[in-house]
Design a protein with these regions (language model features):
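Conserved catalytic core of two-metal-ion nucleotidyltransferases
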Residues: 1-22, 62-236, 243-301, 305, ...
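Active-site nucleotide-donor binding segment shared across nucleotidyl transfer reactions
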Residues: 16-49, 53, 58-59, 208
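Start-of-helix register in tetratricopeptide repeats
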Residues: 321, 378, 412, 420, ...
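Residue-level recognition of tetratricopeptide repeat
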Residues: 328, 385, 427, 461, ...
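Single-residue signature of alpha-solenoid repeat helices
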Residues: 339, 396, 438, 476, ...
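Short coil turns that delineate tetratricopeptide repeat
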Residues: 351, 408, 450, 488, ...
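Register position in tetratricopeptide repeats
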Residues: 389, 431, 465-469, 503, ...
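Canonical tetratricopeptide repeat
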Residues: 416, 424, 458, 496, ...
Length: 759
């Protein structure tokens, strides 16, 4: 957990306690809800906490806030504090600094936050929702100057101007109250739905999707989650929500976070240089321009989409004609690998946000105005079936919904859509532990689609539940074996195979299979199940490893840790001993050097992901120290060199230099002493002093690794310096640069001698 996540967890636990004590409802939402199910805590890269709260509960929380909020905490919402610049409320730490873009010229609290997305009751009549949505967009435009909201819904610019006129001449409070009276006029007991109070996209939910709440674990805290959790996650993220996205697709949120000061101190520093009036005027003109041009821009985007659609269809037709088999034949053969290849470009275009949209800020217009590529019903059916058979059920369902809206919807497409909805019903039954109903629902689906991975995985859950209870274990084994015949590289089924081996007492074989399973799945649920099963054995494993190292059984220790590093790559103790063991058993100097390079890269990567947070990278210290020792650095000097990797403060760096000087170092190790002092000086920015120490290290007749390191330093510096000198020479006189650069080496003769020694 990052430091930011620890702070957010503290804030959330405070809010959770207040809600439970005062019978206030909320549910975990968005990525936080995924974290509850997939990680039982934060998604590793998540940097916020989202909850939903019904409007009546939020209003009650506001009423009691004066007596229940801890020190340095506040509730923010625009209907209470008109200086607040967002449409949804927040629980904020006022003694911290986390400034979002919309707060740049505001006066509201800008600390670390919990987003509380209010759920406003909405009648069943869609016209009432459209009325709410229109006024919510205008409300958002007036509250938040940074973002243009209404253009995506083509809100008339005249409507915005009418309310802007009221805002300007009748006042902010009076105008916003008029809008609030319209938007919040519906009563909870009269409405079957909620709209999420967010200008970005006011999602609609059935009330029974959210309440009554259920309870699940989040970072060892029992939290409220939506009543139909699986339905919510499927609706919001698709059927593939449990899969961990590639690194580049992981979303985070932008905020200027400054440790050690409050948001007031930051604002006092930059606000005097900002022309607030000009920013507000520019913002208003940008909104007017965007709203006025929204329809034109959407028409242009539609025309661009049509051109791309035509070229994509032509490409698809060419691919189909080049295939040795027709689409119908490939479907009958269930050759979905070949079909997926044929449809690759079609999917890239048709499934993009620009064509079918997404229920998010950027994709909402296309979501309500999708563009379908004109292909035959046979082609469309084959494409949708391929999506189902390649674990993209959510995308297939979305496409089928869009196709149905066109009015041309053949029976096989209707059947496929109905079957996907049956599958989702079975998943919902399973969530509520109605196992028999879920299994009965799946039975006809398994007959019609015997090799759909998602369906096979779901059925395997029933069989494994029974096997864990000692019922029909043979049936489970046969089914998992058949599943692995169909999907030999799927870690989901490998994990079950390992579990069955473990039940039979074949633990060593099971661990090997678990390791393969870990490497062959990005399913977060499977990863979590492996973690929960294996983590209790991690501590005993590292103890065994240490015992093996103590008695000199290094190969046995390495074999043990290589396996467990595959099993628990994120377990800190396992990772620490894996690298320590590698440093202990390396047989060649090149292996130790390679290991050091690998560790340093990991440290740099982890620092880049969590700047300023060094908790996780501490686990590499022992391995680095052992590696330096293996390369000839005495114990204390090896520790100094390791500490240098983790140190950047000026006082700490000077202390490291003193430790290197004062260490009880044997005479033959003086080269290493000067080398380490040189490294410290270089990190301090004292280049000349650093190279003086490097030259002295070379004079001490250092041999082996230290001489290799020094040679690399000198030759690299000369190579890079010569390139810079050439640049200076082209621009004019390079003599000043050459004198400064080469001065640290001495005379030309000394430089020539140094090069000979390095080579």
């Amino acid at each position: 957990m990052t430091e930011k996540q620890e702070h957010l967890l503290q804030l959330f636990r405070e809010l959770d306690e207040i809600c439970k004590k005062n019978n206030l409802r909320y549910v975990m939402a968005g990525g936080t809800a995924i974290g509850v199910v997939r990680n039982e805590g934060f998604i590793p890269w998540d940097d916020d906490v989202d909850i939903y709260m019904p409007r009546d509960d939020w209003n009650k929380l506001v009423e009691i806030s004066g007596s229940v909020l801890p020190e340095h905490r506040a509730l923010q919402c625009v209907d209470v504090d008109r200086s607040y610049t967002n449409t949804f409320p927040r629980y904020v730490a006022t003694d911290s600094c986390a400034l979002h873009k919309h707060q740049i010229i505001g006066r509201d609290s800008a600390g670390e936050i919990i987003d509380v997305l209010t759920l406003d009751p909405i009648p069943a009549d869609d016209k009432e929702y459209e009325k709410y949505r229109t006024h919510m967009m205008i409300y958002s435009e007036l509250v938040n100057m940074v973002v243009v909201y209404g253009a995506r819904w083509e809100i008339p610019v005249t409507a915005y101007l009418r309310w802007l006129f009221s805002y300007t001449f009748l006042g902010k409070d009076r105008t916003l109250k008029k809008l609030e009276k319209i938007m919040y006029s519906y009563k909870e007991e009269d409405c079957p739905r909620y709209a999420m109070r967010w200008g970005g996209c006011p999602f609609l939910f059935d009330k029974d999707m959210m309440f009554p709440v259920k309870y699940m674990n989040f970072e060892n805290t029992e939290v409220m989650v939506p009543h139909r959790m699986s339905d919510y996650l499927i609706w919001h993220y698709g059927d593939e929500w449990s899969y961990i996205p590639p690194h580049g697709e992981r979303e985070s949120h932008d905020a200027v976070t400054v440790e050690g000061i409050t948001y007031k101190e930051l604002r006092d520093d930059y606000l005097p240089g900002i022309r607030k009036g000009r920013l507000r005027r520019d913002s208003i003109w940008r909104k007017i321009y965007s709203l006025a041009g929204a329809k034109r821009n959407h028409r242009l985007q539609y025309k661009r989409n049509l051109l791309l659609a035509k070229s994509t269809v032509m490409d698809l037709e060419a691919r189909i004609s080049e295939s040795r088999h027709s689409l119908k034949e490939l479907v009958e053969k269930r050759d979905f690998s070949q079909l997926n290849e044929i449809f690759t470009k079609y999917y890239q275009v048709q499934l993009s946000s620009a064509f079918i949209g997404r229920e998010d800020f950027g994709g909402i217009y296309a979501f309500y105005h999708p563009v379908l590529l004109e292909v035959s019903d046979v082609t469309f059916y084959a494409a949708m079936l391929t999506l189902v058979y390649t674990e993209r059920i959510g995308k297939a369902w979305r496409m089928l919904v869009v196709k149905e809206q066109t009015g041309t919807f053949p029976s096989e497409l209707a059947q496929l859509k109905s079957d996907i909805e049956l599958f989702r019903r079975a998943v919902c039954d399973y969530e509520f532990k109605r196992y028999q109903e879920a299994e009965d629902t799946m039975a006809p689906l398994m007959e019609r689609y015997p090799e759909v991975p998602g369906f096979v995985k779901f059925k395997s859950r029933f069989l494994m539940e029974r096997a864990r209870n000692g019922i029909d274990m043979v049936e489970a084994e046969l089914y998992i074996d058949e599943a692995l015949r169909l999907f030999p590289e799927d870690g989901y089924f490998l994990k079950y195979q390992g579990e069955l081996l473990w039940m039979k007492g074949k633990c060593a074989d099971a661990l090997e299979v678990f390791a393969d399973a870990r490497e062959k799945t990005n399913n977060g649920i499977t990863q979590l199940e492996l973690d929960k099963f294996l983590n209790p054995y991690g501590r005993e494993t590292v103890k065994t490893c240490q015992q093996l190292l103590d008695v000199g059984q290094k190969d046995g220790a390495m074999k043990l840790m290589a396996l467990w590093y595959r099993l628990l790559p994120e377990n800190p103790s396992v990772r620490e001993y894996y690298y320590l063991t590698r440093a202990s058993v390396a047989k060649k100097r090149s292996e130790v050097e390679e290991l050091i390079g690998e560790i340093l890269k990991r440290i740099d990567a982890e620092r880049a992901e969590s700047p300023g947070e060094n908790n996780d990278i501490q686990i590499y210290k022992r391995a680095l120290t052992k590696a330096w020792e293996r390369l000839g650095y005495p114990g204390e000097l090896a520790r100094v060199r390791t500490d240098l990797v983790y140190t950047s403060e000026a006082d700490d760096l000077e202390w490291l230099a003193e430790r290197a000087k004062d260490g009880q170092i044997r005479k033959e190790k003086r080269a290493q002493v000067y080398k380490v002092i040189g490294d410290v000086r270089r990190k301090q920015g004292q280049t000349e002093a650093a190279f003086q120490n490097y030259l002295e290290a070379l004079r001490q007749n250092g041999s082996g690794f230290v001489r290799t390191e020094l040679s690399r330093i000198f030759l690299t510096d000369m190579y890079e310096g010569s390139k810079r000198a050439a640049v200076y020479a082209k621009a004019g006189d390079a003599s000043e640069f050459l004198n400064q650069w080469l001065g640290k080496y001495g005379s030309i003769e000394e430089i020539q001698q140094l090069v000979k020694e390095c080579l």
